[in-house]
Amino acid sequence: MSAVQGHWREVSEQTLPAATYLNDSTRTSSQLIIIVERKEDWASYFPSEDIVTAQEYLEQSGDREQGKRVQVINLCRSYKYLGHGYYCSLLAEARGHKVIPSVRTISELTRKSLYGLALDDLDKTLEKALSHHAYSDTEGFTLTLYFGKTNIEPLQDLARQLFEIFACPILLVEFRRTNGWHIEGIKFGALHKLREDQEDQFAHSLDSFS
């Protein structure tokens, strides 16, 4: 039995609770866990004892985190259904850890029909933000967000709102202009595909988030 299959059994035999935290009298400490698909995905950053591979996280019993407030950042290369990334978020929630992206976010971003309605109110914000920006002369562009942050100041408020709706470490947001600006699509970004300049932005945003 593979690690993924074994931990699917572990998760399926539990009641999946919402991420909850111990009260102040019982909370002993907090812990950050950063999950990567492969160790080399973290090669551009400082070594950290917070880093574990997806395989390691799935094979751990979770006993070491008992009594701790745990934040999990899932940076797997893919969150496809029944893949390692999906199982890591599923298992984190089963253990009571706070994880991004959540299983709900993973499910919603797989189909625009599920997340499209949440974007309707943001189109007005987008139109106002881009009305006097350099991008106003283009037909479209894709913006990469890191923990809800962007270097494009007029779009920072929109980036924050998107992160509040779809909390995910890296998001690729496609903007198009057809009789006004709108969000054409949103998909997950991947750590191992970032350029060098993007790696710096990601690192700064991660520091601010964690």
Predicted features, each with a name:
Residues 2-210:
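Preference for protein termini
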